[in-house]
């Protein structure tokens, strides 16, 4: 009788089935991880802009003169120090009223962010009293810590 050299067809089919089951579990979990990390990245991108807004308002610069961009600031106009497309996942916008109330938003773009985040928005909202709140239109599972839905 000859010694066996290799695997039988059934053994190979079992290995392929096991790999398929593991992939069916791992791929959705990885996609969820990516969506959560994108939310955290977006918030980390816009969170430092609060400091620039607060400094500008405390120097007496009107809220409507606080703009997005990296142009040098002047005595009457402040640029927050980032371009609208600073993060490849989406677009940043700053809209502050003269009262000091306003929003810093991050809008996820379709095609560059996870499909689970596409067109979702993270907003840092400032009241005229200087209180900041974070809101998100993301699924609660993907919303960064410190943000509400």
UniProtKB/Swiss-Prot annotation:
The chain crosses the membrane at residues 7-27. It holds the Pfam family N_methyl. GO terms for biological process: cell adhesion involved in single-species biofilm formation; regulation of calcium-mediated signaling; single-species biofilm formation on inanimate substrate; type IV pilus-dependent motility. Disulfide bonds join 134-147. It comes from the Bacteria. Disruption phenotype: Mutants show a significant reduction in the efficiency of extracellular protein secretion. They are also defective in twitching motility. Its main location: other. Keywords: Cell inner membrane, Cell membrane, Disulfide bond, Fimbrium, Host endoplasmic reticulum, Host membrane, Membrane, Methylation, Transmembrane, Transmembrane helix. GO terms for cellular component: cell surface; cytosol; host cell endoplasmic reticulum membrane; pilus; plasma membrane; type IV pilus. It is found in: Fimbrium; Cell inner membrane; Host endoplasmic reticulum membrane. The modification N-methylphenylalanine is found at residue 7. It is a single-pass membrane protein. The keyword Ion transport does not apply. Methylated by prepilin peptidase PilD at the amino group of the N-terminal phenylalanine once the leader sequence is cleaved. Belongs to the N-Me-Phe pilin family. Interacts with itself to form a multimeric tubular filament structure with a diameter of 51 Angstroms. Interacts with PilJ. Interacts with PilS at the inner membrane. Interacts with type II secretion system (T2SS) components XcpT, XcpU and XcpW. (Microbial infection) The ssRNA phage PP7 infects P.aeruginosa O1 (PAO1) through the retractile type IV pilus (T4P). PP7 binds to T4P by interacting with a single pilin subunit PilA through the Pilus-Interacting Region (PIR) of the phage maturation protein (Mat), and is brought to the cell surface through pilus retraction powered by ATPases PilT and PilU. Then Mat enters the cell envelope, causing pilus bending and pilus detachment, which impairs cell motility and restricts the pathogen's virulence. This is Type IV major pilin protein PilA. It comes from Pseudomonas aeruginosa (strain ATCC 15692 / DSM 22644 / CIP 104116 / JCM 14847 / LMG 12228 / 1C / PRS 101 / PAO1). The lineage of its organism: Bacteria, Pseudomonadati, Pseudomonadota, Gammaproteobacteria, Pseudomonadales.
């Amino acid at each position: 009788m000859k010694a066996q050299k290799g695997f039988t067809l059934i053994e190979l089919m079992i290995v392929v089935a096991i790999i398929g089951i593991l992939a069916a579990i791992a791929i959705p979990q990885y996609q969820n991880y990516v969506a959560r990390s994108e939310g955290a990245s977006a918030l980390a991108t816009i969170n430092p802009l609060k400091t620039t807004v607060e400094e500008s308002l405390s120097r007496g610069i009107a809220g409507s003169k606080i703009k997005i961009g990296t142009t040098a600031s002047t005595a009457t106009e402040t640029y927050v120090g980032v371009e609208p497309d600073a993060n490849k996942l989406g677009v940043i916008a700053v809209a502050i009223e003269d009262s000091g109330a306003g929003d810093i938003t991050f809008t996820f773009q379709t095609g560059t962010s996870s499909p689970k985040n596409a067109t979702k928005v993270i907003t840092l909202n400032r009241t005229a009293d200087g209180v900041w709140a974070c809101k998100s239109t993301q699924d609660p599972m993907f919303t960064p810590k410190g943000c509400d839905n």
